[in-house]
Amino acid sequence: CLVMANLLVRQAGRAFTPTDVSKAWLALQSKNAYFTAERIAYRNFMNGFLPPESAWYKNPYREWIGAQIRGDYFGYINPGNPEAAAEMAFRDASISHVKNGIYGEMFVAAMLAKAAVCSDMEEIIRTGLSEIPESSRLFEQVSRVLEAYLAGASFEETLQTCLYCRYDDQNGHHWCH
């Protein structure tokens, strides 16, 4: 992910577009390099779909964590500028994801940009939250976990109240949701 993002920015510049991302994927990696949302998006590119349609057309994984995994580089190249990191992450994520799938990448990129100039973990997390919609499920869930932590809940208690009780993977939710 880091190498691909680096090549993208070197070739298309910091103002790259989602279409630049899709073209880089097609030019630089094989179709077998991807899984879940990214594999569907790649197939959609090959079938002529451009972003953002490439993200949602027949893509049941469109809100999973694949884009979140790609967010690191945009945080690294924007130290102290979480807004720029999140904006670049949005453009990258929008080719393969929608809603919380996009917000995850924005959240990670913003936190890494902030972490370059700040060591306060709560401030870093709140910075990440400030870059995603307050109405999103990701914002709600990360806020719950943060509040549980600040209230002194143990890791196990936090898992139980914030994850297992809310998202039972036996009840229609995959853990990647």
Language-model region placement:
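Structured, active/binding-site neighborhoods that engage oxygen-rich ligands
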Residues: C1-H177
